[in-house]
């Protein structure tokens, strides 16, 4: 504590032995030891108090730092809250302006006007009902006529009936005609200068044998 070395202690002991003598030296040593203990105890207590104070100061500094950070956070939160409130107020003002503009553009009907409108509507309805009752039942709307294509019936199958076979009755001279052969017909050459009229030929046997 006092930074006293071994040589210094021996020097102090020799001086005390010479001054006090051998009889008083033990008592003086005990007294000096007690004072040294007390001084050390005091020093230790002071040292501990100093350390405690230093720790308390450090804690205070740390608390101050924390408080400063908390204050900064509070300031930031307040600024944000103010910004949000300003935005909400601006939005509220815009909405109120729009509502005022719309309300001024479209006037609100009073209760008297609403009652008058209801009465007029009921009067119109009664008048229309009376007119409909006096005119009689309204004719039913004509149903739209839709021309439907009728299916074409197939034509009846026509059966061709063969005509009766005509029986040809031979004439009495038919046998003679078939049995007698016809003579050959001779054609004379016709000149260019002469007329093209045919010359009468001799009557055939068929013509002679006519009845």
Swiss-Prot record:
A matching Pfam family: TatA_B_E
The alphabetized UniProt keywords are: Cell inner membrane, Cell membrane, Membrane, Protein transport, Translocation, Transmembrane, Transmembrane helix, Transport
Q: Which Gene3D superfamilies match?
A: 1.20.5.3310
Q: How does it sit in the membrane?
A: Single-pass membrane protein
MF GO annotations: protein transmembrane transporter activity
* Ranges for region Disordered: 175-211
Start-end of Polar residues biased regions: 194-204
Residue ranges crossing the lipid bilayer per the database entry: 1-21
- So which domain of life are we looking at? Bacteria
Cellular compartment(s): Cell inner membrane
Output the Gene Ontology cellular-component terms.
TAT protein transport complex
Give the chief site where it resides.
membrane
- Enumerate the InterPro entries for this protein: TatA/B/E (IPR003369), TatB (IPR018448)
Q: Please cite one Gene Ontology biological process associated with this protein.
A: protein transport by the Tat complex
Presence of the UniProt keyword Membrane in the record: yes
Matching entries from PANTHER family are given as:
SEC-INDEPENDENT PROTEIN TRANSLOCASE PROTEIN TATA, CHLOROPLASTIC (PTHR33162:SF1)
Query: Could you describe the subunit structure of this protein?
Result: The Tat system comprises two distinct complexes: a TatABC complex, containing multiple copies of TatA, TatB and TatC subunits, and a separate TatA complex, containing only TatA subunits. Substrates initially bind to the TatABC complex, which probably triggers association of the separate TatA complex to form the active translocon.
Q: What does this protein do?
A: Part of the twin-arginine translocation (Tat) system that transports large folded proteins containing a characteristic twin-arginine motif in their signal peptide across membranes. Together with TatC, TatB is part of a receptor directly interacting with Tat signal peptides. TatB may form an oligomeric binding site that transiently accommodates folded Tat precursor proteins before their translocation.
Recorded hits in HAMAP family, A to Z, give: TatB
Q: Which NCBIfam families match?
A: PRK04654.1, tatB
**Family, per entry:** Belongs to the TatB family.
* Protein name according to UniProt: Sec-independent protein translocase protein TatB
Q: Which organism is it from?
A: Xanthomonas oryzae pv. oryzae (strain MAFF 311018)
Q: What is the lineage of its organism?
A: Bacteria, Pseudomonadati, Pseudomonadota, Gammaproteobacteria, Lysobacterales
């Amino acid at each position: 504590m006092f930074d006293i070395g071994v040589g210094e202690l021996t020097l102090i002991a020799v001086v005390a032995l010479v001054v006090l003598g051998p009889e008083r030296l033990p008592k003086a040593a005990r007294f000096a030891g007690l004072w040294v203990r007390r001084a050390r105890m005091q020093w230790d207590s002071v040292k501990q108090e100093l350390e405690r104070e230093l720790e308390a100061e450090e804690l205070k500094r740390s608390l101050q730092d924390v408080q400063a950070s908390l204050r900064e956070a509070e300031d930031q939160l307040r600024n944000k809250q103010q910004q949000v409130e300003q935005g909400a107020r601006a939005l509220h003002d815009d909405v109120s302006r729009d509502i005022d503009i719309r309300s001024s553009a479209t006037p609100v009907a009073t209760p008297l006007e609403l009652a008058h409108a209801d009465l007029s509507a009921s009067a119109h309805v009664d008048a229309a009902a009376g007119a409909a009752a006096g005119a009689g039942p309204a004719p039913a709307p004509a149903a739209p006529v839709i021309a439907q294509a009728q299916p074409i019936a197939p034509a009846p199958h026509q059966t061709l009936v063969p005509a009766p076979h005509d029986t040809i009755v031979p004439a009495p001279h038919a046998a003679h005609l078939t049995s007698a052969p016809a003579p050959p017909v001779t054609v004379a050459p016709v000149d260019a200068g002469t007329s093209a009229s045919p010359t009468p030929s001799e009557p055939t046997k068929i013509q002679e044998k006519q009845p």
